[in-house]
């Protein structure tokens, strides 16, 4: 049977919370995971807020979609803000478990957007009549066609894929920040590891 135990660290090992290992590859290694997490959460909120504004215009101004869609999007935006606030508090307190709600929220958003994109593509493949039947639940398809052209389901798919890509990028960064906090807590408890703090800005 192979030995599954992790090899002990060398006696002269020096841990640094500012090691290049903790600079996010998703930012071309230009930012520490903690800094990148704040920025990615802010970008996520901007995207969600922009979506809420667009849904408000479409539901309350042009009346092309149901008003309930705007309220759902507004609720998602509020959840984004709340989970980001909890994440920021967790980073401040150096508690990686408090980042869990943000990661779960992002996973839900990714799944929802990918499903929405697939539905849009399938509707385009089956023709305009099928598209009108499916999307008629959400709004006035004829009005949407007048405002956004005949290939509007393609636009929905593109926006969904683009937003999902941003969410995946955000999740990678925040997961890296959580791993960083777990590492920091682990090495802080090791008696044979020198925890080297730096005054360098994260």
Swiss-Prot record:
Species: Caenorhabditis elegans
Topological domains annotated Cytoplasmic: 1-37, 90-107, 170-202
Annotated Gene Ontology cellular component terms: cytoplasm; plasma membrane
Transmembrane segments: 38-58, 69-89, 108-128, 149-169
Primary site of residence: membrane
Topological domain ranges for the Extracellular compartment: 59-68, 129-148
Domain of life, per lineage: Eukaryota
Keyword annotations: Cell membrane, Cytoplasm, Membrane, Transmembrane, Transmembrane helix
Topological category with respect to the lipid bilayer: Multi-pass membrane protein
Cell compartments where the protein resides: Cell membrane; Cytoplasm
Entry protein name: Protein cuti-1
Lineage: Eukaryota, Metazoa, Ecdysozoa, Nematoda, Chromadorea
